[in-house]
């Protein structure tokens, strides 16, 4: 069986959104945007899920936790 990975690009301050929240943590339909991506990727048979973070890394990491 081959190894399959997914990479979530979750870096970015989101300054154009004019909000104190980081872009990937903005809620869409009751969940942070990044959670929608994680939910969809969790349906796949992946070896590992890698999340790239930048600005607000600690807040993003605290939400993502061990999901990636």
Curated annotation (Swiss-Prot):
The lineage of its organism: Bacteria, Bacillati, Bacillota, Bacilli, Bacillales. One of its GO terms (biological process) is lipid A biosynthetic process. It comes from Priestia megaterium. Catalyzes the last two sequential reactions in the de novo biosynthetic pathway for UDP-N-acetylglucosamine (UDP-GlcNAc). The C-terminal domain catalyzes the transfer of acetyl group from acetyl coenzyme A to glucosamine-1-phosphate (GlcN-1-P) to produce N-acetylglucosamine-1-phosphate (GlcNAc-1-P), which is converted into UDP-GlcNAc by the transfer of uridine 5-monophosphate (from uridine 5-triphosphate), a reaction catalyzed by the N-terminal domain. UDP-N-acetyl-alpha-D-glucosamine binds at residues 9-12, 23. GO terms for cellular component: cytoplasm; membrane. PANTHER family: BIFUNCTIONAL PROTEIN GLMU, NUCLEOTIDYL TRANSFERASE. In the N-terminal section; belongs to the N-acetylglucosamine-1-phosphate uridyltransferase family. This is Bifunctional protein GlmU.
